């Protein structure tokens, strides 16, 4: 009896895992981190329950966008080694089910955010989801190498959403956090595109290395990384502990530029991978430090 029970549970566990991966959890983690940062550093008070609700809505909104993105991109995901094991191309979840999950989570997250938190946060969450789906996924991704640059605005909105959850308004401080993520996104994804250049080419996705070549992509990575550095110093102007922040942000940012320079002068994929991995660690540490420096 016990063996039968365990056997019956396994398919359910696998199904839950498949739907979880449909929501792009790795992206969700960073989205939640940046959203929570906005909540924590915003002036004023917020009830802990409202803060939790806002965070959950941001997470659900991110997952909703991820699910609909996988629904729309299932054809090209099936062509690339990096993405062909995703739930839809792997045959674990149907396209219709993925779309239903995405639409339901979009509605739930935006509605709850509007009712339980405030209208502006709900509207911004809806804009973030809509921009990622309609502007980036459905329009830009398959048409222009600037897909990541423009589309990055969707992923840069969570700290503003977190901020408005507390204050009910957008401020310069929240826009600085937006700008950091906006400038971080291109070099992060261009490093990934260098690693998967041939796969993007096979899937006919006009990533920068495919349309303009590897050398041009390296120049763009270096330029954006250099421009990102002074922008990341701006939070020191409004955080309560600017010294703690700057002594962390400066070496972090310099290392980011160093990694970008390594990518520029190297043709070894190892450096592309290091840049991609470091960029994730970089954003995690930077926003954690922003939160800690606000106390």
UniProtKB/Swiss-Prot annotation:
Catalytic activity: heme b + (2E,6E)-farnesyl diphosphate + H2O = Fe(II)-heme o + diphosphate
EC number: 2.5.1.141
GO cellular component terms given for this protein: plasma membrane
Keywords: Cell inner membrane, Cell membrane, Heme biosynthesis, Membrane, Transferase, Transmembrane, Transmembrane helix
PROSITE patterns per UniProt: UBIA
Membrane spanning stretches: 30-50, 51-71, 93-115, 119-136, 148-168, 175-195, 219-239, 244-264, 275-295
Family: Belongs to the UbiA prenyltransferase family. Protoheme IX farnesyltransferase subfamily.
Any further remark recorded for this protein: Carbon 2 of the heme B porphyrin ring is defined according to the Fischer nomenclature.
Protein name as catalogued: Protoheme IX farnesyltransferase
Source organism: Ehrlichia ruminantium (strain Welgevonden)
Taxonomic placement: Bacteria, Pseudomonadati, Pseudomonadota, Alphaproteobacteria, Rickettsiales
Gene: ctaB
